[in-house]
Regions:
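Acidic-aromatic/histidine active-site loop/patch
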Residues: 101, 126-128, 236-312, 415, ...
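A cross-kingdom feature marking solvent-exposed beta-strand/loop segments within repeated
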Residues: 170-189, 288-290, 326-355, 528-533, ...
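N-terminal edge beta-strand
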Residues: 115-141, 280-295, 510-544
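Surface-exposed loops/turns
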Residues: 139-141, 186, 198-199, 298, ...
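Extended terminal and domain-junction accessory segments
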Residues: 18-95, 210, 214-258, 336-558, ...
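Asparagine-centered strand-capping/turn motif at beta-strand->loop junctions
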Residues: 149-154, 306-311, 549-553
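Aromatic/His-enriched, Gly/Pro-containing loop or helix-boundary segments
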Residues: 123-138, 168-202, 230-231, 339-344
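Cleavable N-terminal signal peptides of Sec/SRP-targeted secreted and luminal proteins
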Residues: 2-19
């Protein structure tokens, strides 16, 4: 427990401000800034502030919020609103000019508008409205979300993906470059507009290259009226400031680590972790930057929304000192409440927990740490409101101070998902309610069966660099290996235009042929030839598929697989027995599933619902997917270096006549390859030619 707390004494043993002075206070008299220069004048009355998660708006009433046009409001009795956000994406820097004397210990300068402190290490970043994380979107179900994305980055196109939102009415707003839209070029603006549904905890992030890890992400929360929230009886408060984004952080731009280094700084691991964009490095030489505080009251129960905003392969452990975590939702869907000591968070995960603040008023550590060989931590503070004066800080915890205990989603310690083990798998958890159509989702015989096997392809130097074929294939140097990544022995290549919104056929030589035995049976890997193509699997609209995600690779990586456009119902998770042939195991597993299918609605009536499913090394997950959302939907590993080197594919759900058409004027793009006529320029008289 933290006793006699004062933040800066933690490292410097000098007088400092009370932590109470650092915290934002809810202010019900706020007025929103209208007529902002960055906003569309026609929408200025709908503009939302950048600091929703600051605590300033936590206690505002529905009536007061709607009076000033604030979309972050209690949703009981709320009228649908237009919620407009104007975002400028630009090259920026941590502890830059806006921070003044922050690094010299002036905490008021650290809190200046435009000051991004991160962990106090100065580095270039990418930012949304000069914030990390980017502005939080918090609205009520049924609102209309409008986001103008202005790309002011010097050398980068971009898109924004709304992670976990189905986009049923607006598939062209999913934000995947060259799949659902053209990238947003530098100097242009793209308007995302979609209905706020379903309710739950989501987040937004760039889906272009490695930009997400350099700062382009933020929270997105859609609430329903409390009277309609089936898990609201578990908590007293669901505050806008109690949204937590966990991120891994490098001290250089992420693309400086791609495709990898051979001689210096070769690791693709984080240098730090951030909690809501902040951390204070535990070193005598560390800069004087603040950490994040979350304010609570004794004997109250608070809903916290935890977002796995990390990008790299190392999972994060989340814990709150002396406070168990009551899990009530995952990836936006309620679950039967259960208690754990820690959360194991993978990239893309979201977990809602209730913290019962029943301790004596004080301050308690919130910690995130990696589970990899080099343990890196970030700390924040759970601060009880109290009349006592806060003075000094106690010892900061090291990486082993808090035991892991019973941990949710701990695929590293319980990959077989055995019962009675401290590692709890999602397949062992029940959703709060059965599927809306249990006889469809859990039908005895699925309409389709797919196996999605993830693996890596190891290049030889000769094949990649010296073989005289003038091919330039993507690779990632995971020193000493040089690899790319695959699903079903196919390394994904982006199409030359977005197939969702442009009906031109993709060139046949770019599409993975479904009957290509050289890709399907794996002989291409053994022979050293890579299948690199646009991998699309077609599914009938309304079909229910049984999908087996399985790791056929030889690495020690865990793969958080994310599906756009719909959810997965987790039926089973486990580990492939050692020494068993991959195909033989798949056949055994499918035979078992077929045998048990007749009773699935009885034996597994409330499967957990998620859009991110993590596969451990040599592990698997069996899921049911109801493909009821027409369009082109990405499925990919959320480890950023894996997805960007081929561990992706597309589900085409339905046919073009079943697709929802994009709005008029929707941007188009394609390769430009005009015909070449040898005589085209012969008739031109050049100024430098003799007459």
């Amino acid at each position: 427990m933290l006793r006699n707390f004062c933040l800066l004494i933690l490292i410097y043993s000098k007088p400092c401000l009370s932590a109470i002075d650092i915290l934002p206070v809810a202010d019900t008299s706020v007025q929103l800034q209208v007529g902002r220069e960055d906003a569309d004048p026609q929408l200025s009355k709908y503009i939302q502030p950048n600091d929703i998660a600051s605590g300033r708006y936590d206690n505002i009433s529905t009536a007061d919020a709607e009076k000033i046009g604030l979309c972050a409001r209690p949703c009981d009795g709320a009228k649908p609103m237009v919620c407009y956000y104007s975002w400028t994406l630009e090259n920026y820097a941590t502890v830059g000019p806006a921070c003044g004397d922050c690094l010299k210990g002036n905490q008021s300068h650290c809190r200046r508008k435009g000051c991004v402190t991160a962990d106090g290490f100065e580095r270039p970043i990418l930012s949304i409205n000069r914030q990390i994380p980017g502005p939080s979107i918090q609205v009520c179900k049924g609102d209309t979300i409008v986001v103008d994305v202005k790309n002011h980055m010097l050398d980068r196109a971009t898109t924004i993906h709304w992670h976990g939102v189905y986009m049923k009415a607006t598939p062209y707003m999913d934000g995947v470059p060259m799949v659902t839209q053209c990238p947003i070029p530098t100097g242009t603006t793209f308007r995302y507009k979609f209905p706020a549904t379903p309710e739950g905890t989501f987040f937004h992030h760039s889906h272009h290259g490695l930009q997400k890890m350099d700062g382009l992400e933020g929270s997105l929360v859609i609430r329903s009226p409390r009277a309609k929230d089936p898990i609201s009886s578990n908590y007293d408060y669901d505050l806008y400031s109690h949204v937590i984004i966990l991120t891994d952080w490098m001290h250089s731009m992420t693309d400086s680590k791609f495709p990898g280094r051979s001689h210096n700084d070769t690791r693709a691991k984080p240098d730090a972790l951030l909690i809501n964009g902040q951390n204070q490095v535990p070193s005598d030489n560390s800069p004087r930057v603040p950490m994040h505080f979350f304010k609570v009251q004794k004997d109250k129960k608070y809903r916290f929304r935890i977002i796995g905003g990390s990008c790299l392969a190392c999972p994060l452990i989340f814990t709150v000192e002396n406070h168990p975590l009551l899990v009530i939702a995952s990836d936006g869907t309620p679950v039967e409440p259960f208690t754990v000591d820690t959360l194991t968070m993978f990239p893309g995960d979201r977990v809602d927990v209730v913290i019962n603040c029943n301790q004596e008023p004080n301050l308690f550590w919130i910690q995130a740490k990696t589970i990899c060989d080099t343990q890196i931590t970030a700390e924040a503070v759970l601060q009880y409101s109290s009349g006592q004066k806060l003075k000094y800080v106690s010892k900061r915890p090291n990486s082993s101070a808090f035991k892991r205990g019973k941990s949710l989603n701990a695929m590293d310690i319980n990959p077989e998902c055995k019962s009675g083990v401290d590692g709890v798998c999602w397949s062992q958890i029940n959703a709060l309610k059965a599927p809306l159509e249990p006889n469809v989702v859990l039908k005895p015989v699925p309409d389709k069966k797919f196996v999605l096997a993830v693996s890596e392809f190891f290049y030889t130097l000769d094949a990649l660099f010296w073989k005289d074929n003038d091919q330039y294939q993507r690779f990632f140097q995971a020193s000493p290996a040089i690899v790319t990544h695959m699903i079903n022995n196919r390394s994904f290549m982006m199409p030359p235009f977005p197939p969702l919104t442009q009906s031109d056929p993709i060139p046949p030589n770019m599409v993975c042929p479904t009957d290509d035995s050289k890709c399907t049976d794996g002989s291409n890997v053994k022979g050293g030839k890579l299948c690199e193509c646009v991998n699309i699997i077609q599914v009938d609209l309304g079909a229910v598929a049984e999908v087996i995600f399985i790791d056929w690779g030889s690495s020690s990586f865990l793969h958080p697989m994310h599906l756009h456009g719909t959810d997965t119902y987790i039926i089973e998770q486990g580990l492939k027995p050692k020494g068993v042939d991959n195909k033989a195991f798949i056949q055994q597993l499918q035979d078992k599933l077929a045998k048990n299918g007749a009773n699935l609605a009885t034996t597994k009536p409330k499967p957990c619902v998620k859009d991110v499913v993590t596969i451990p090394p040599s592990g698997y997950a069996v899921v049911r997917i109801h493909f009821n959302n027409p369009g082109f939907w990405m499925c990919h590993c959320h480890y950023i270096f894996h997805s960007d080197t081929g561990m992706s594919m597309i589900f085409q759900v339905g046919t073009r006549d079943q697709f929802i058409k994009p709005p008029p004027g929707f941007p188009v793009c394609n390769s430009f390859m005009p015909k070449v006529d040898p005589d085209e320029f012969k008739s031109i008289k050049w100024d430098d030619e003799p007459t």
